[in-house]
Amino acid sequence: MLKIHNSQSKQLEDFTPLTPGQVKMYVCGPTVYNFLHVGNFRGPVVFNMVRNWLEHLGYKVTYALNFTDVDDKIINRANELGMSPTELSEKYIAEYKKDFASLGLRPHDMNPKVTEHMDDIRSMVESLVSQKKAYEAQGDVLYSIESFKDYGKLSGRNTDDLLAGARVEVDEKKRNPMDFALWKAAKPGEVSWPSPWGPGRPGWHIECSAMIKNLFGDQIDIHGGGMDLIFPHHENEIAQSEGCTGKAFVKYWMHNNMLNFGGQKMSKSLGNIVTMREFLEMYNAEIYKWMILSAHYRTLSDFGDEAVERAVGGLSRVYSALSMAESYLTPEVTQEDAAFAKITQDAWKKVEEAMNHDFGTPDAFAAMFEVVRQFNAQVRRGMKANPAIQGKALAFHNFVRKMGSMMSLFQEPAHAFLIKLDDMLLKKMNLERSAVDALVAERGEARAAKDFAKSDELRAKITALGISVSDTPEGSFWEVTK
C-alpha cells in the first residue's frame, strides 16, 4: 500500500483518497514575471512523477497547477519594462510552458490563473467577513488569525511564538500583527478589480484557496508545493479554507525540498540563478530530470557541476545498455527470455516497494541499476543475435521503458540520445566529432596493418582527450569518458 509523508502530521500515512479510486491534486505554481530558474522546476518534475505513480496504481488523478498572474513582483516588473501586468504575465506563462514542454513532462489537467478567478476570490472573502473570520480596514480585508484556533497546525508554530519572534511591520489597521491580507485596497496606478470594499486586488494566500474551492470543492486529497511555502502561504490557506467551510481542507500535504547552488539557496540577490532555458541550452532535459529524481523529493539537493556529472554518468549507463538492447530488437522479437524476465519482475517488485514508501525514487533507481548490471553481464555488443540474446534484450528494454514511463525519463531513442550526450560533452571539451572520428579511424587502420605500436600510441592519445574506445567484432566504437 502507498504511504505518503504528510507534512502536517510529520508522519508516513497510508494513502486513502477522499473518494475511492480518485485523486484531486493541486500544486502551487509559479509567479510569472521572468524566466523561471532550475529550482522552480523541481516541484513540477516531482509532482509529475507522483501523478504518474498514482495512475500506475490505478487512481484517476485530476492535477491542477496554478499561475499567479497578479502580484507585487509582476506589477513592479511590468512598470520597469513599460508593459501591462497582463502582457508581462502572459509572456512568461508562455515561456514557462515552453520550458515545461522541453522537459518532456505531461501537461497538467488544469492551469488556473488568478485573474480568471476574481469572482471566486471575492465570494470567499465575503464569506469569511460574514462569518467574522475577517474584517475590513480602510479598503483592505484582513484575516483574523485569532478566529482560527488551529492556526499553526501545519508549520508547528503557535501564535505566541510567532509574535515573540516576528519582525512584523506595525500596521494600525491590524487587530493582531499576524493578521494577513485577503484583499488589498488599490494603490494609484496599480491594476485593480471592483469589490464590496472598494477597488483592489487579492492577497496571495486567498488566491489558491479560492481556486481550489472552485475547481475541486471544499476538500482535496493532495496539496503540493515547495517547503518554503509551508509558512506562511500554506498555513494561511488552511486558515482561510477551513475557516470558510468548516471542513478539513487537505488530506495529505506534500512538500518538495529546495535546490542549492554551491551550498546556497538559489536567489537573485546572491546572483546564483540559472534559468531553465539556460540549462537546457547547455545540457539536456533528461539530465535535469535525473538530477531531481535520483534524490528523494524531501531531501535538500545540490545543483552544480558535480550533480550534472553524476546525472550524465547515470544516464550514460542506462542509455548505453538500452542502445545495445535495441540493436538486437526487430519487429519479429516478441518473446522475452524467461530467466531475464524473472530478473526484471523481481526488480520491479523492489521499484514498487520503493515508490510505495513515500515515492522513494533513489531506491527505485538502485533496483534499475541492478538490472542494468545483470544485462551488461549477460549481453555484450557484437554478440551474434539469437533468440536467447534477443529475449534478454526485449525484457531489459521493456523494463527500462516501463520505469521511464513512471519518471518521464528514458523518452528518447537510445542511440540518438548517446550521440547527443557525447556532442554536448565534446562541445564543453572544445573537441570536434570529426577530429575524434579521424583519430579512431587512423587507429583502426594501424590495427588492420598490425602496426600495434602506432595503434597503442593513438589509443593513448585518444584516451588523453577524454575518449574511451571499445573494440568489437563489428569494429571500434568510441564515446566520451563519463
From Swiss-Prot:
Zn(2+) binds at C28, C208, H233, E237. It comes from the Bacteria. Binds 1 zinc ion per subunit. Its cofactor is Zn(2+). GO terms for cellular component: cytosol. This is Cysteine--tRNA ligase. Monomer. One of its GO terms (biological process) is cysteinyl-tRNA aminoacylation. It catalyses: tRNA(Cys) + L-cysteine + ATP = L-cysteinyl-tRNA(Cys) + AMP + diphosphate. InterPro entries: Cys-tRNA-ligase, Cys-tRNA-synt_Ia_DALR, Cys-tRNA/MSH_ligase, CysS_C, Rossmann-like_a/b/a_fold, tRNA-synt_1_cat_dom, tRNAsynth_Ia_anticodon-bd. The gene is cysS. Keywords: Aminoacyl-tRNA synthetase, ATP-binding, Cytoplasm, Ligase, Metal-binding, Nucleotide-binding, Protein biosynthesis, Zinc. A motif ('HIGH' region) lies at residues 30-40. One of its GO terms (molecular function) is cysteine-tRNA ligase activity. Belongs to the class-I aminoacyl-tRNA synthetase family.
